Amino acid sequence: MAISKDDILEAVGNLTVLELNDLVKAFEEKFGVSAAAMAAPAAGGAAGGAAAEEQTEFTVILADFGANKVGVIKAVREITGLGLKEAKDLVDAAPKPLKEGVSKADAEAAKKKLEEAGAKAEIK
């Protein structure tokens, strides 16, 4: 019997966050792809109507790691759950999106934690 799409969705839905992280890494290794979110193309004329609505999803951007690189790496690990190497690579690549599609409260908390560690962060 073949596994259906619904069976896969049900199985993935029952995984913990750590198990999902391991699954994503396994997909990246097996298929040679990256799970990094791609930038969406800019919308043309429809952007005017959407601007009137209140923004509900925010992106936290690590603009600069400042003088305390080690502290910023620790903060990035806490915020994202990344491993040490991945967090260091992300900090080294600043400016870089750290979290995407999060609520305003989560974005503010992440920005505060980064700034307390000595980094410069932005919310878009």
Swiss-Prot record:
GO biological process terms held by the UniProt record: translation
Any one Gene Ontology molecular-function term assigned to this protein's record: mRNA binding
InterPro entries: Ribosomal_bL12, Ribosomal_bL12_C, Ribosomal_bL12_C/ClpS-like, Ribosomal_bL12_oligo, Ribosomal_bL12_oligo_N_sf
GO cellular component labels: cytosolic large ribosomal subunit
Annotated keywords: Ribonucleoprotein, Ribosomal protein
HAMAP family according to UniProt: Ribosomal_bL12 (MF_00368)
Family the UniProt entry places it in: Belongs to the bacterial ribosomal protein bL12 family.
PANTHER family from the UniProt entry: 39S RIBOSOMAL PROTEIN L12 (PTHR45987), LARGE RIBOSOMAL SUBUNIT PROTEIN BL12M (PTHR45987:SF4)
Subunit-level organization: Homodimer. Part of the ribosomal stalk of the 50S ribosomal subunit. Forms a multimeric L10(L12)X complex, where L10 forms an elongated spine to which 2 to 4 L12 dimers bind in a sequential fashion. Binds GTP-bound translation factors.
Function per UniProt: Forms part of the ribosomal stalk which helps the ribosome interact with GTP-bound translation factors. Is thus essential for accurate translation.
Record-given protein name: Large ribosomal subunit protein bL12
